[in-house]
Amino acid sequence: METRLGYYKWHIIIAIVVIVCSLVIYNSVTSDKESDLSFVFVSTKYMNTQYFKDAKPELELLLKDVNHDSSRVADVKAFAEKSEGDVLKRLEECIASGEYDAYIADKQAFEQIRDKSVFEDASVYIPSNEKNEYLEDSDGRLYAVSLKDNSLAKRLGIIENDGLYIAVGVKTENGERTGKMKNAMNISGYIINSRDKYKM
């Protein structure tokens, strides 16, 4: 009996080790499946929920096209707030969380963000031939761009997009822009340029 238990003991131990290793590998693979781009919308403007749900696959298609990579994953969230104060509070929370790469929100909220340095210099990713309305900080640095008459905003179900602006959050490692930040800049450039030239 003891001999048989001793014989099977190693089989049991090996089986446990294999199961544990499999779980570790599975968790590492699934955890690496984080998004390549995270967008958040915060506004008091009218938002059509169904249109907004459709934004994720469409942004992913744009990501894949821009990066020439079919494995790209996008994450999109929206918060429809009741007042300008609620929009500002939510936007500050989203920025502090570090979860998002690009932000679309009401103009008034962007104007009241005290630390403008949390946003990338918008002149880096704005098409040079575009005529847009911008928000500038005290140093004359552009940090948010208007989406007025923007076809993508309308496509996403944001009907009243006159007062909406877009900005890219600063994300760096060792002084260099992260891949996610570069993606956010590229996609934001496309969105800004989508009045009639690029329609998803």
Predicted segments — roles?
Residues M1-T3:
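Cytosolic juxtamembrane amphipathic/interface segments immediately preceding
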Residues D86-R141:
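Extracytoplasmic "Venus flytrap"/periplasmic binding protein-like
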Residues Y7-V29:
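Hydrophobic membrane-insertion alpha-helices, especially the h-region
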Residues K33, F41-K107:
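Early extracytoplasmic/lumenal segment of secretory-pathway proteins
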